[in-house]
Amino acid sequence: MRVLLICLLLGLAPLAGAETFTVGVELQPYMPYSSVVEGHYVGYGRDLLDAFAAQQGHVFVYQPLPVRRLLNDFLNGRLDFKYPDNPRWNADKKQAYKVYFSQAAAPAIDGVLVKPQFLGQGKERLRRLGTQRGFTPWPYLDDIKAGKILLIQANQIDSLLAMALNDRVDGVYLNPQVVQHQLYNSTKTESLVFDPSLAHQDDYYFLSTLNHPEVIEQFDAFLINQAELVQTLKDRHGISNPLTGH
């Protein structure tokens, strides 16, 4: 796997001004985007950031942390960068800070996955909606606040999938590509499917910083100038928008 990446990077010329930075990343498994295996950060996020660092001559040291601590350490200045991030995530806690965000580094859709026999049956049957703790099902907040939908949270994605497969929830609000990756590895590939007719959030993942906007500018230029490499990494990891395939 790494051999392919090295070959791709042969055409990238490192630039002057190399530095070492600490990048805070999520400890939770979220493949194909990212995971932590035996203490090592892996996945699309790792390969993308490594490719950028190689071009610039920077050194990225990855610090996997639980989601809540990751945000706190980032805002308290203990990390140089946070990935992934999004301007909407914990926006209230970020209000007092000047956070610099990159251009979109990866597409991400959060939506509802249901059993195939329930595909296209509408929001009315969603009485119990499962999601991962820390996730916000934005399109369904009004219904949750009104008591029309009961939100059930779990720490682990596999726990949520088990709930859906055992009809303990009517659907799960997650990233479809992450769910399909988990189901593929458990030989239950078609047991839950993304329902595009239900409300979903079409979004992106970004790199963020408090103190290094110049590196964010470098990263933005990398995403543009090395678009072919970035797309190769997306294809390699199966990263795409499930609605468009891109």
Please tell me what each predicted stretch does.
Residues 68-82, 157-178, 185-186:
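Short helices/loops that flank or line small-molecule/ion binding pockets
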Residues 49-55, 116-131, 135, 205-239:
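Extended ligand-binding regions for polar small-molecule ligands
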Residues 19-93, 153-154:
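Extracytoplasmic small-molecule ligand-binding "clamshell" domains
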Residues 28, 39-51, 115-148, 162, ...:
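Bilobed "Venus flytrap"/periplasmic-binding protein-like clamshell domains
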